[in-house]
Swiss-Prot record:
It comes from the Eukaryota. Ca(2+) 2 binds at D165, N167, D169, R171, E176. It is a lipid-anchor. The keyword Metal-binding applies. InterPro entries: CaBP1/2/4/5, EF-hand-dom_pair, EF_Hand_1_Ca_BS, EF_hand_dom. It comes from Homo sapiens. This is Calcium-binding protein 2. Ca(2+) 3 binds at D202, N204, D206, E213.
Length: 220
């Protein structure tokens, strides 16, 4: 596939929101929302909705009117670096490749939410079941250009994750989740509701939320 140095990708500027400041715009719910205020959502939706609203400041929105005029500019060095950071986040064995299974989550950290069909089609085009960084840039370049809203950057997601992971062990425990929710929502959530939120987000059932589960939660 092509060389990113020879064919730099382009996309529009980003406008980050302030941490827990003014009400978020676009698709991110207000931090003041609670499950009780949203009726009786389907199982699994409530936890994602509450945590997603709390991490609303991690959402980065592209202004469509500006993006439309910026599609022809070259991708800046810091934007190439952002791709590198996202890639390295999921290159766990540091061999310079990420597998098809990690590719979807990696794409989500950059704000692109691939469908299952898209992931299947991509996996069929990947030789050897894995991609290197050059292939990743080749793949994500056009998608980053096409995105005009709801962009979530890996650095912002990592910063938001650290707000919950207070002991820095790379996982969010029940206690850490309870403390974060209490600090942000006061006493509006019961112990049972906190446990239900953790259960909804904890995909592998180990009682903890790791960064990949956190990314998937933010993609819902």
């Amino acid at each position: 596939m092509g060389n990113c140095a020879k064919r730099p990708w382009r996309r529009g500027p980003k406008d980050p929101l302030q941490w827990l400041g003014s009400p978020p715009r676009g698709s991110c719910p207000s931090p003041s929302s609670s499950p009780k205020e949203q009726g009786d959502p389907a199982p699994g939706v409530q936890g994602y909705s509450v945590l997603n609203s709390l991490v609303g400041p991690a959402c980065i929105f592209l202004r469509p009117s500006i993006a439309a005029t910026q599609l022809d500019r070259e991708l800046r060095p810091e934007e190439i670096e952002e791709l590198q950071v996202a890639f390295q986040e999921f290159d766990r064995d540091r061999d310079g490749y990420i597998g098809c299974r990690e590719l979807g989550a990696c794409m989500r950290t950059l704000g692109y939410m691939p469908t299952e069909m898209e992931l299947i089609e991509i996996s069929q085009q990947i030789s050897g079941g894995k991609v290197d960084f050059e292939d990743f840039v080749e793949l994500m370049g056009p998608k980053l250009l096409a995105e005009t809203a709801d962009m979530i950057g890996v650095r912002e997601l990592r910063d938001a994750f650290r707000e919950f992971d207070t002991n820095g062990d790379g996982r969010i425990s029940v206690g850490e989740l309870r403390a974060a929710l209490k600090a942000l929502l006061g006493e509006r959530l019961s112990q049972r509701e906190v446990d239900e939120i953790l259960q909804d987000v904890d995909l592998n059932g180990d009682g903890l939320v790791d960064f990949e589960e956190f990314v998937r939660m933010m993609s819902r």
